[in-house]
UniProtKB/Swiss-Prot annotation:
The lineage of its organism: Eukaryota, Fungi, Dikarya, Ascomycota, Pezizomycotina. Residues 1-20 form the signal peptide. It catalyses: Endohydrolysis of (1->5)-alpha-arabinofuranosidic linkages in (1->5)-arabinans. Keywords: Carbohydrate metabolism, Glycosidase, Hydrolase, Polysaccharide degradation, Secreted, Signal, Xylan degradation. GO terms for cellular component: extracellular region. Pathway: Glycan metabolism; L-arabinan degradation. InterPro entries: GH43_arabinanases (IPR050727), Glyco_hydro_43 (IPR006710), Glyco_hydro_43_endo_a_Ara-ase (IPR016840), Glyco_hydro_beta-prop_sf (IPR023296). The record marks 166 as: Important for catalytic activity, responsible for pKa modulation of the active site Glu and correct orientation of both the proton donor and substrate. Its EC number is 3.2.1.99. It is found in: Secreted. GO terms for biological process: arabinan catabolic process; xylan catabolic process. It comes from Aspergillus terreus (strain NIH 2624 / FGSC A1156). This is Probable arabinan endo-1,5-alpha-L-arabinosidase A. Belongs to the glycosyl hydrolase 43 family. One of its GO terms (molecular function) is arabinan endo-1,5-alpha-L-arabinosidase activity.
Length: 338
């Protein structure tokens, strides 16, 4: 059952009760870092995820039944960096204090640009800033139709203050921006060219948590009404079966908003997102633990939907046991509420 509630902005950050249970999922529901898109020609849903050289599946609705198609890029990426052969194995990933430990070919972001389906993916290696965001395209998303275009030009090394993974493309009235980043100085944004295939100019920071390990990643920008909402994952993502984080330090989904797509994001208390601001949208509750790796999808029947991965504590805490979750979002208070 799906439900929603409305709270005033000052109370929103403190709301920890009343989260709706994740929406139904049948078929292939084990997933990490999902990205959701709907094909224009027939309304079929496609879902991309980390692992297996970008695994993807399809369904007739967001609830499923989800059928695995296979690897998006079975021959790997043309980006010449460690990790382009997709060695990430979710079931054996463990948290070691470094961001995205063992996650090497990851975090897809599916978008449609001028009638062509784009999937942006990340190539990286264990705890490294030697990372890049790549692009693959298809006109149908059918198996075997993907063309790998290699790097978008968004790359990082140890000389940078960011990590070039977790890309998310945003179309602001025909102007494209790539949001990206994980730990270090957290979330950055870079203008893209008009085809959304290559970076056009230098990046700049849009979200940063100065505390602790700067545990911010997986940003997703979504416009609703007059505001741009910057969703992101905060906390420890992985390895819960072998090393459970302190209560409250596990993954959760936060948000800031702005009247501009390019900065000045604040939370419900007015704290800048570049200074540790962030209002909780979804966190651990009931049998849901560590929700994150999120995106927002405008469903033709349901409206705005928050989708993510999570651990069902009744099943198990291993990374390979994480499930696809989704909830309808209520923006009636001016802030997204599950």
């Amino acid at each position: 059952m799906r439900a929603s509630f409305v709270v005033t902005a000052p109370l929103l950050a403190a709301a920890v009760h009343g989260y709706a249970a994740p929406g139904a999922c049948s078929g292939a529901c084990n997933i990490h870092d999902p990205s959701l898109i709907r094909r224009e020609s027939d309304g079929k849903y496609f879902r991309f995820s980390t692992g297996n050289k970008i695994s993807y599946a399809s369904a007739s609705s967001i609830e499923g039944p989800w059928t695995t198609i296979g690897s998006m890029l079975p021959d790997g990426s043309s980006i010449d960096l460690p990790g382009n052969d997709d060695l990430w194995v979710s079931a054996h990933a463990t948290w070691t204090g470094v961001p995205h430990a063992n996650r090497e070919y990851q975090a897809p972001d599916a978008q449609i640009v001028n009638g062509v389906y784009h999937v942006y993916y990340s190539v990286s290696s264990f705890g490294s800033q030697n990372s890049a965001i790549g692009l693959a395209t298809s006109t149908s998303m059918d198996a075997g139709t993907w063309t790998d275009h290699g790097s978008t030009g968004i790359q990082s090394s140890s000389s940078k203050n960011y990590n070039a993974i977790d890309g998310n493309l945003f179309n602001d009235g025909g102007t494209y921006y790539m949001n990206f980043g994980s730990f270090w100085a957290d979330i950055f944004q870079a203008p893209m060219n008009s085809a959304a295939t290559k970076v056009a100019s230098s990046s700049y920071g849009i979200a940063y948590d100065p505390s602790g390990t700067h545990a911010v990643e997986g940003s997703y920008l979504y416009k609703y009404g007059n505001y741009y909402y910057l969703f992101y994952s905060w906390g420890i993502c992985c390895g819960y079966d072998t090393s459970r984080p302190a209560a409250g330090q596990e993954y959760k989904i936060k948000v800031c908003r702005s009247t501009s797509a390019t900065g000045n994001f604040v939370d419900a208390d007015g704290v800048a997102c570049t200074n540790g601001g962030g209002t909780v949208v979804l966190e651990s509750h009931d049998n849901v633990y560590g929700p994150g790796g999120q995106g927002v999808f405008t469903d033709p029947n349901l409206g705005p939907v928050l989708y993510y991965h999570y651990v069902d504590t009744n099943i198990g805490y291993a990374d390979g046991q994480k499930l696809f979750g989704w909830n309808v979002l209520d923006f009636s208070s001016g802030w997204p509420v599950v």
